[in-house]
């Protein structure tokens, strides 16, 4: 007996909220597999080879992973060469602004933004950074 993943309407709703971001971001792709669900690929922009993949089985997982990637995109634009776990207050404001169009479509997932920034803040508490 073969197992088949089911792409729920909620998963499709989450994917559609990120469609503009996915179309404009060359370093990632999102694929659907009936065997494993959504597959999030990171792509090396120089070699055009996949670097990693992650299986995502639920709408919250999918949304969280894409919000994480959006935050990383903002951090890379700062050219400070660090990830979002080291962001400062101004960068947190930029990340929230970048997330805004998606969260307007998915207000029930706004809590994920808070979780991401809270985790970043917890990682930086020893440095006295306040991301709120």
Give the location of each predicted region.
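Short, surface-exposed beta-edge/turn micro-motifs
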Residues: 25-28, 36-38
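Non-Sec secretion/translocation targeting segments of pathogen effectors
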Residues: 129-132
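Short, exposed beta-strand/loop patches in secreted or surface proteins that constitute
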Residues: 19-21, 28-32, 53
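Acidic, low-complexity, intrinsically disordered interaction modules
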Residues: 34-120
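Negatively charged, low-complexity tracts enriched in Asp/Glu with abundant Ser/Thr
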Residues: 2-25
């Amino acid at each position: 007996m073969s197992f088949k993943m089911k792409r729920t309407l909620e998963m499709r709703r989450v994917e559609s909220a990120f469609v503009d971001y996915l179309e404009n971001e060359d370093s990632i792709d999102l694929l659907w597999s009936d065997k494993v669900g959504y597959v999030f690929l990171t792509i090396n922009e120089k070699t055009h080879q996949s670097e990693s993949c992650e299986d995502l089985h639920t709408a919250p997982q999918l949304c969280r992973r894409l919000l994480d990637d959006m935050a990383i995109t903002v951090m890379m634009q700062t050219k400070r060469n660090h990830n979002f776990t080291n962001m400062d207050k101004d960068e947190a404001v930029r990340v929230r602004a970048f997330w805004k169009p998606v969260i307007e479509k998915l207000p029930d997932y706004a809590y994920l933004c808070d979780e991401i920034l809270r985790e970043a803040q917890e990682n930086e508490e020893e440095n006295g950074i306040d991301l709120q």
